[in-house]
Structure formats: structure tokens, C-alpha cells
């Protein structure tokens, strides 16, 4: 993924909510922390939830799994509804912004946008593009890039230098047409994780998150945030 490189975003609801506000999203939906994966802690997350973002480490084990998963889907096929908004990632460290775009784009009907919203404009202009075209469009979309850069400096930890290699990655988990989709711009296509509903999205998404953790039991660097009705 040579070429453009952005500063990474934190998996921090304050940062993501401020970022989306600056892009013209009305705060009727807000990101909140998911403090744990067990039912008691999940019950603390305000409902309804329309998306979950997972931050996880890219490890050797994960990369082996990713390659195997891709080959399996290419040989066996999978059902993916044409309603899914999916884009590729061509900008290093832009996975946080792409995760947010995936979360909002696939819940656009639930969202309220301020007049002149940059994000609404981007989504409307890219709606009929291919995943690759959307990636290239983002590369040249200065209004989002500048807002991302500002937000990357607003986290609780100091932003790394632009050249520092970052091995943490964001994906979005969303409900589209009755199915749970994993949207990861590093992958060639969305991953269909089976049936879900608006009511069970959080629990179903967390089951997928648990599989990421089980694949790397020695890793602690996992963080999930949920997009909840405010």
C-alpha cells in the first residue's frame, strides 16, 4: 500500500464522534465504548446499535488466516447483497476513516446530516462507484483528509510520526439486508458472516470479534466501539 499515508485514528469514541461531527453528521447516533464481550458488559451499551468497529493487531497468524479465508471464498463463493457499500483501502493508516465511512454509508437511511455535510457529499458522489474507484476518490478528497489529520491529533495518546509502521487495523461490522458483513478495505470483498437483525447486531458482531481474539490469544490489543442511538 505504497503512496499516501495518513496518521492513524484512535479507537476512541470522543475522537470518532468529533470527527463525524466535523464531517457534518448530526449526533443522533454516537460511538460508545464496548467495555467487554460478556453479556453483562454488552447490556451497558445503549441500543439500538447499527455498527461495530473493531481495532485489532495485524499479526502473522491473522495474515495466514486472511489468505486462507480469501482463497476459500474465491473457490466456494458467498452471497453478498448489492446494497452493501464497500470501498478498498489504498491509503496507509486510513482504516479508521474507512471504517467510519463503512459504518455510516451502510446506515445512511438512519443518519441525519447537517446542511453542506462533507460526508454526505462524499457518499452521494461515490454511491455508484466500484470499491476501487471509491478508494481513489478518497485519495483526492482533501476535506476528509484534513479532518482526519486533525482528529488523529486529538486522541489520548500522542499520534505516531507519519512514517512509523502501525500494525493495528480497523474493520466495520454492519447489518445489511438481514446479514452481518465485515467490511475491511484490505480485503478484496465484504465478508458475509451470516444472518443478523437490528436487534441482535451487537451480539452477532461481538461473536465475530471474539473469533479475532481467539486466533491471537497472546494479543491484548483489541478494542471495539459501537455506533448507538444517542
Swiss-Prot record:
Protein localization: Cytoplasm
Gene3D superfamilies: Peptidase C12, ubiquitin carboxyl-terminal hydrolase (3.40.532.10)
Activity regulation behaviour: Inhibited by monoubiquitin and diubiquitin.
Pfam families: Peptidase_C12 (PF01088)
GO CC aspect terms: cytoplasm; cytosol; Golgi apparatus; nucleoplasm
Keywords: Cytoplasm, Hydrolase, Phosphoprotein, Protease, Thiol protease, Ubl conjugation pathway
UCH catalytic domain segment(s): 5-229
Active-site residue numbers: 95, 169
Reactions catalysed: Thiol-dependent hydrolysis of ester, thioester, amide, peptide and isopeptide bonds formed by the C-terminal Gly of ubiquitin (a 76-residue protein attached to proteins as an intracellular targeting signal)
Source taxon at top rank: Eukaryota
More about this protein: Identified as a tumor-specific antigen in colon cancer.
Protein name per the record: Ubiquitin carboxyl-terminal hydrolase isozyme L3
Organism ancestry: Eukaryota, Metazoa, Chordata, Craniata, Vertebrata
Gene that produces this protein: UCHL3
Amino acid at each position: 500500500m505504497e503512496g499516501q499515508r495518513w496518521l492513524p485514528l484512535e479507537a476512541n469514541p470522543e475522537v470518532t464522534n468529533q470527527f463525524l461531527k466535523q464531517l457534518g453528521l448530526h449526533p443522533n447516533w454516537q460511538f460508545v465504548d464496548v467495555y467487554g464481550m460478556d453479556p453483562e458488559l454488552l447490556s451497558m451499551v445503549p441500543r439500538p446499535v447499527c455498527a461495530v468497529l473493531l481495532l485489532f493487531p495485524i499479526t502473522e497468524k491473522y495474515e495466514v488466516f486472511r489468505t486462507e479465508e480469501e482463497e476459500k471464498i474465491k473457490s466456494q463463493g458467498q452471497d453478498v447483497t448489492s446494497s452493501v457499500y464497500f470501498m478498498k483501502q489504498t491509503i496507509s493508516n486510513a482504516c479508521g476513516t474507512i471504517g467510519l465511512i463503512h459504518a455510516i454509508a451502510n446506515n445512511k437511511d438512519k443518519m441525519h446530516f447537517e446542511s453542506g455535510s462533507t460526508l454526505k457529499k462524499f457518499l452521494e458522489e461515490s454511491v455508484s462507484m466500484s470499491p476501487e474507484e471509491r478508494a481513489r476518490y478518497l485519495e483526492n478528497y482533501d476535506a476528509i483528509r484534513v479532518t482526519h489529520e486533525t482528529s488523529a491529533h486529538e486522541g489520548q495518546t500522542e499520534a505516531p510520526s507519519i512514517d512509523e509502521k502501525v500494525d493495528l487495523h480497523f474493520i466495520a461490522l454492519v447489518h445489511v439486508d438481514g446479514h452481518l458483513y465485515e467490511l475491511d478495505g484490505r480485503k478484496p470483498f465484504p465478508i458475509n458472516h451470516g444472518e443478523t437483525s437490528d436487534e441482535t447486531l451487537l451480539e452477532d458482531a461481538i461473536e465475530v470479534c471474539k473469533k479475532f481474539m481467539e486466533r491471537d490469544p497472546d494479543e491484548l490489543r483489541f478494542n471495539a466501539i459501537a455506533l448507538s442511538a444517542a
